Amino acid sequence: MIRYVLVIITCFLVAAKSHVTIGPVPNNLGFPDRSILLALVAPTCEPELEGLVDECVNNVTIRNVCYDCFREGLTKVYSYCCHKYNHMYEWCLEYFSGEMK
């Protein structure tokens, strides 16, 4: 239950950040507060991903978190969600790039 609350909070923060950011974004693989988002997403992703095969597509919660992170340019979080457990980073990159077009 706590994991799902964290997911909702994370999605809200990512959505709010996209509306609040004004001016140039620093060129450091994402926004300045990406470590905060990573701290929120990491505990959520870990139990959900462990032992599952095609998590980026099959699990709606994790797919949405990964997609939001990818869309916001938070590549460190995106890589954590899709690559660390599944070694699917390239596949996910193509999948989400296609979704964004």
Curated annotation (Swiss-Prot):
The record lists the organism as Lychas mucronatus
The UniProt keywords, alphabetically, are: Disulfide bond, Secreted, Signal
Cell compartment(s), UniProt: Secreted
The free-text tissue note of the record is: Expressed by the venom gland.
Q: How is it modified after translation?
A: Contains 3 disulfide bonds.
| Cleavable signal peptide | 1-16
Q: What is this protein called?
A: Venom protein 214
Q: Tell me where it mainly resides.
A: secreted
Where is it found, in Gene Ontology cellular component terms? extracellular region
